[in-house]
Amino acid sequence: MDPNTVSSFQVDCFLWHVRKRVADQELGDAPFLDRLRRDQKSLKGRGSTLGLDIETATRAGKQIVERILKEESDEALKMTMASVPASRYLTDMTLEEMSRDWFMLRPKQKVAGPLCIRMDQAIMDKDIILKANFSVIFDRLETLILLRAFTEEGAIVGEISPLPSLPGHTDEDVKNAIGVLIGGLEWNDNTVRVSETLQRFAWRSSNENGRPPLTPKQKREMAGTIRSEV
């Protein structure tokens, strides 16, 4: 196993532990708590994939961080922080909408690269909006935290989430997954639109009807997925 993979996991475990202590002291805001909950699932998946114990990894990560901090000067820390571009966290959904449990009458699930797409095939003839919480850097979608499909009544009927065992995805991965979800929902005569915020930062454009400008390749993939998966 690559030692850098192990050390990266160890440091991530320790930093999650520190963030959890911050949350326990009620010092974290809603985006902070969102990321904490999602990262916990990701770490469990990575630990299972790597065959590493999280508690042991956390202790090892603490030693790595302590060693680095002893070597780090305040001036070097300031320069490092100044050179790193800051990402923004955008929220279409409230904390309640993100954390709410939901179930499917006719469940369908598909893995598209590092993302998992879930939808309820029992939903028909509904107006649906896709909302997402995600981070943005350089005015472009950086990391999807969670996307959910809501009916006008507020019911959750679909979802796109990162796979804990496959961390890391691109904006193209997200757009392709959205295309698959839209196609699956429209197969049952639902009308689907995407939130203006998500359109703006994923596609850098927005349409009044809420439809993102899917590429011909995405349309072909969407159509093929509908025929074979839904």
UniProtKB/Swiss-Prot annotation:
Residues 218-230 have a biased composition (Basic and acidic residues). Its main location: host cell. Residues 180-215 are annotated as: CPSF4-binding. Signal peptide: none annotated. InterPro entries: NS1, NS1A, NS1A_effect_dom-like_sf, uS15_NS1_RNA-bd_sf. It comes from the Viruses. Disulfide bonds: none annotated. SUPFAM superfamilies: Ns1 effector domain-like, S15/NS1 RNA-binding domain. GO terms for biological process: symbiont-mediated suppression of host cytoplasmic pattern recognition receptor signaling pathway via inhibition of RIG-I activity; symbiont-mediated suppression of host gene expression; symbiont-mediated suppression of host mRNA processing; symbiont-mediated suppression of host PKR/eIFalpha signaling; symbiont-mediated suppression of host type I interferon-mediated signaling pathway. Keywords: Eukaryotic host gene expression shutoff by virus, Host cytoplasm, Host gene expression shutoff by virus, Host mRNA suppression by virus, Host nucleus, Host-virus interaction, Inhibition of host innate immune response by virus, Inhibition of host interferon signaling pathway by virus, Inhibition of host PKR by virus, Inhibition of host pre-mRNA processing by virus, Inhibition of host RIG-I by virus, Inhibition of host RLR pathway by virus, Interferon antiviral system evasion, RNA-binding, Ubl conjugation, Viral immunoevasion. One of its GO terms (cellular component) is host cell nucleus. Pfam families: Flu_NS1. Upon interferon induction, ISGylated via host HERC5; this results in the impairment of NS1 interaction with RNA targets due to its inability to form homodimers and to interact with host EIF2AK2/PKR. A motif (Nuclear localization signal) lies at residues 34-38. Residues 205-230 are annotated as: Disordered. One of its GO terms (molecular function) is RNA binding. The dsRNA-binding region is required for suppression of RNA silencing. Inhibits post-transcriptional processing of cellular pre-mRNA, by binding and inhibiting two cellular proteins that are required for the 3'-end processing of cellular pre-mRNAs: the 30 kDa cleavage and polyadenylation specificity factor/CPSF4 and the poly(A)-binding protein 2/PABPN1. In turn, unprocessed 3' end pre-mRNAs accumulate in the host nucleus and are no longer exported to the cytoplasm. Cellular protein synthesis is thereby shut off very early after virus infection. This is Non-structural protein 1. It comes from Influenza A virus (strain A/USA:Phila/1935 H1N1). The gene is NS.
